[in-house]
Amino acid sequence: MSSKRASQYHQVEIPPPQPFLKSLKNTLNEILFADDPFRRIRNESKTSKKIELGLRHVFPILEWARGYSLEYLKSDVISGITIASLAIPQGISYAQLANLPPILGLYSSLVPPLVYAIMGSSRDLAVGTVAVASLLTAAMLGKEVNAVVNPKLYLHLAFTATFFAGLMQTCLGLLRLGFVVEILSHAAIVGFMGGAATVVCLQQLKGLLGLHHFTHSTDIVTVLRSIFSQSHMWRWESGVLGCCFLIFLLTTKYISKKRPKLFWISAMSPLVSVIFGTIFLYFLHDQFHGIQFIGELKKGINPPSITHLVFTPPYVMLALKVGIITGVIALAEGIAVGRSFAMYKNYNIDGNKEMIAFGMMNILGSFSSCYLTTGPFSRSAVNYNAGCKTALSNVVMAVAVAVTLLFLTPLFFYTPLVVLSSIIIAAMLGLVDYEAAIHLWKLDKFDFFVCLSAYLGVVFGTIEIGLILSVGISVMRLVLFVGRPKIYVMGNIQNSEIYRNIEHYPQAITRSSLLILHIDGPIYFANSTYLRDRIGRWIDEEEDKLRTSGDISLQYIVLDMSAVGNIDTSGISMLEELNKILGRRELKLVIANPGAEVMKKLSKSTFIESIGKERIYLTVAEAVAACDFMLHTAKPDSPVPEFNNV
């Protein structure tokens, strides 16, 4: 390398200047339209074709309906009926969990699936209510309004919270701000969902033990205290019946997991439990007074509820808070589920379009007596395994639910509440993903800490504390990643021009007169002081080592900036300050491999003038060769004679 001639060094070019508005437009396009959603429309010359493509983009049903076949219809009908058999008992159960009338669970499986079938981009997502959002609704609304004492206000606030959730989801999608939801890391979601599932299971002990009075708190200590303080109120009939159905449900889940072709056994088991539980109690309710049942469910499809929305103080802020928090959680779950099944079938879904679809189905749902819905994993997994081809399976499910609402609701009168509790517990146990937690422990201890913190926050605190911990630790992790970028010493891989981390490649060769440091991240206000201090420490350690070994003293500090995607004014000030500090120590700063954005910023400052263009190189290899040239043929201050432009 040292024999490389000066004329072979390449000068790092400064990117041509761009008008501010054009630069701003490009930046916004990268942030908001990274997937270039209007590419097909932009490349079309005919106005009518552009309108058609635009409508197909907004309403995906127009896209998949064009090639729809009888074979697809057969698959979607089977899938729709299958998920309806799961949606009906789950809907009733989750409405109970949210402290809402059971009929709302059926209402929420009618309108939202129809809206999603028109606007949703996932072929496999099955829309409905979910346990975590139901529990959040109950926990947050229940703090201010008692569902038993003031059921009408509680119901109206649930509709209003659903409206605000839908409005927030729609706005995020329209403004292309989907990345906001991604602030929750995978580890945080695993911990939060696991904690919420644990809390839901604990809450269901009320139904399993036949208790009439129960705590509104969700932390494990208060719940267990409430359970054992009422041990004299436990109903053995309820407990035995609940355990029998729970064992049945878990057995069918185990069979379906071991033999995926028998997925329908697990899918049908909740409905089978409801049917057998209802028949059992219908004939034996006189003998088993301790078993509570649903009672009357009103016949008919969804009544309008737009006039019931509450937009007046003091409750509007409560509904807004509940709507935003539950909406974000539901959105994160729905998009994650949709993407996972899209990956299995090798197609893509548009996250921003999904947000708009979720938002519209919740807005319209709030107008038609529905509470918050999203794409639950259990229902979507059944839909996927049943062989669905398009979102029409949601329409079939909605039709089946409508038939139930119009003609079959009286049949649920004697459905035992303990059966609904068993259905919820069986569904929630699958959300405690211990395998994912073990994987996090093996892969990344910090991610495991994030997961554990979120879990413990929910279980021993409240849902809100768990959510705050999940977001807070995720943000802290993000700040640590960017605010404390890695800096490591690089060495030369023998007989090559490749330079790598010497800790990763111990055989890499270092030079006594050169210290090559790689900065692994952007340089900006949050990390500039840290980088300056850390670089200073590396230099001190290197000089101490050279002093001890008696080698040639340190002459050049080469900063490899290949991973520095951007730099701000604080970062530039740090480089200028570092150059002055090194100058006082008779050391020379050399920059290698700066990116276009970095060079553009540096060219507008005084840094290049102060350091000199002759100390900025295209690659680390050329920077090292130039330093060798100056060390062996000239004084350290001497510039490299010539550069070739690239």
Swiss-Prot record:
InterPro entries from the UniProt entry: S04_transporter_CS, SLC26A/SulP_dom, SLC26A/SulP_fam, STAS_dom, STAS_dom_sf
Recorded topology in the membrane: Multi-pass membrane protein
Annotated compartments: Membrane
GO MF annotation terms: secondary active sulfate transmembrane transporter activity; symporter activity
Topological domains annotated Cytoplasmic: 1-76, 121-124, 176, 257-262, 337-354, 469-646
PROSITE patterns tied to this protein: SLC26A, STAS
Location of the STAS domain: 504-627
Tissues of expression: Expressed only in leaves.
Extracellular side of membrane: 98-99, 146-154, 198-235, 284-315, 376-390, 433-447
UniProt keyword list: Membrane, Sulfate transport, Symport, Transmembrane, Transmembrane helix, Transport
Regions that span the bilayer: 77-97, 100-120, 125-145, 155-175, 177-197, 236-256, 263-283, 316-336, 355-375, 391-411, 412-432, 448-468
Record's keyword annotation contains Transmembrane helix: yes
Keyword Transport: yes
Cellular component GO terms held in the UniProt record: membrane
Function: H(+)/sulfate cotransporter that may play a role in the regulation of sulfate assimilation.
Family to which this protein belongs: Belongs to the SLC26A/SulP transporter (TC 2.A.53) family.
Protein name: Sulfate transporter 3.2
Species this chain originates from: Arabidopsis thaliana
Gene name for this UniProt entry: SULTR3;2
